């Protein structure tokens, strides 16, 4: 009977391998079908579900690794829940929303000009050019790339994965705390509201939900003095319109729906900018040198996208970069302290 044990073990491994391949194939079919019928998984909760179920399928037959998926990926869930709850946190705390400070800061930085207004005056066309496809995709990568990086690291090196999770969760939670105590309106909202509309610092005045067309003097943001032929002569929120060239109207509708349901006054700091530079900095020494220009370009294109499409002020982006640098430095110091403490 003993000589048969290896054969039995080998047969069991073959069965588990077949089961794993079938599970992965089924996962691929489900994801492709849902993508084709309902659009890309821009909803972060759904994306996290896709990743976790895919990792579970790929872990069949590998001991306790399936359980590790649930244990290891739990830290991401509180971040998503906290972000959803942050919408009303500032109201509960009683903090007024900042409407004027970022506009004034950008004007001071750029000698009286507001970069969002300046860029839309000179670049916005009546119909989205090809490069708006690029910036729409770069903007949406914020909701996808960190989770994909985490999934790859989890499969390749769990120590690296743990280091990345510390950066992701740490940066996200600090930003969420700041959103609760310092709510701030983005440029697209400032273009829709006048000083009278936002007396007292409301978080969700009615002016935020109307078009910027016809708002006196361009609202708090200031009026566009010129525009390209045929383009609207007011500042618009245009981050998703690039997908119109690809007929991805479902994706645009999903993003618009998602934008309407999240915290609309979470502008300072820009988590888009902060997390982008944090991911780039984390990968900088972990990728071949030839990829580093792409990481740097990614950070800069994201910054341009956020300003041009009226998602963030420049000062929001600078503060996002600063927060990322502080979090990375604190984590590095903490890890160095742990290593020294372990050797002691």
Question: What do the predicted segments below correspond to?
Answer:
Residues 66-141, 145-148:
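Intramembrane catalytic core of multi-pass membrane enzymes that act on lipidic substrates
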Residues 181-285:
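Membrane-interfacial catalytic/cofactor-binding modules of polytopic membrane enzymes
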Residues 71-77, 147-181, 188-205, 209-212, ...:
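Interfacial segments of alpha-helical transmembrane regions
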Residues 26-35, 79-85, 172-180, 297-308:
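Aromatic-anchored segments of alpha-helical transmembrane domains
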Residues 55-65, 151-158, 283-287, 329-334:
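Structural signal for the C-terminal ends of transmembrane alpha-helices
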Residues 244-344:
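Membrane-embedded catalytic cores of phosphoryl/pyrophosphoryl-handling enzymes
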């Amino acid at each position: 009977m003993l000589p048969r044990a290896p054969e039995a073990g080998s047969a069991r491994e073959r069965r588990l391998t077949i089961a794993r391949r079938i599970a992965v194939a089924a996962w691929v079919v489900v994801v492709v079908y849902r993508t084709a019928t309902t659009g890309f998984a821009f909803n972060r909760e759904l994306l996290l579900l896709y990743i976790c179920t895919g990792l579970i399928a790929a872990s069949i037959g590998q001991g306790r690794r399936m359980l590790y998926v649930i244990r290891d990926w739990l830290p991401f869930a509180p971040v998503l829940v906290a972000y959803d709850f942050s919408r009303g946190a500032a109201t509960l705390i009683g903090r007024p929303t900042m409407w004027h400070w970022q506009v004034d800061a950008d004007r001071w930085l750029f000698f009286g000009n507001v970069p969002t207004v300046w860029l839309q005056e000179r670049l916005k066309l009546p119909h989205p050019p090809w490069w708006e496809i690029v910036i729409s995709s770069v903007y949406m990568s914020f909701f996808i790339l960190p989770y994909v990086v985490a999934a790859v690291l989890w499969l390749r090196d769990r120590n690296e994965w743990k280091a990345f999770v510390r950066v992701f969760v740490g940066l996200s939670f600090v930003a969420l705390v700041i959103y609760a105590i310092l709510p701030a309106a983005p440029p697209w909202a400032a273009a829709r509201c006048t000083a009278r509309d936002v007396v007292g610092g409301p978080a969700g005045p009615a002016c935020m939900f109307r078009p910027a067309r016809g708002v006196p003097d361009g609202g708090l943001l200031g009026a566009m003095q010129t525009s390209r032929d045929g383009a609207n002569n007011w500042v618009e929120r245009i981050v998703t319109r690039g997908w119109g060239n690809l007929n991805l109207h479902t994706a645009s509708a999903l993003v618009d729906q998602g934008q309407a349901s999240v915290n609309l006054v979470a502008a300072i700091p820009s988590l888009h900018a902060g997390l982008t530079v944090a991911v780039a900095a984390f990968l900088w020494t972990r990728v071949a040198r030839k990829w580093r220009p792409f990481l740097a370009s990614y950070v800069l294109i994201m910054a341009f996208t956020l300003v041009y499409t009226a998602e963030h002020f420049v000062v929001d982006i600078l503060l996002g970069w600063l927060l990322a640098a502080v979090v990375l430095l604190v984590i590095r110091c903490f890890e160095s302290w742990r290593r020294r403490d372990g050797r002691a």
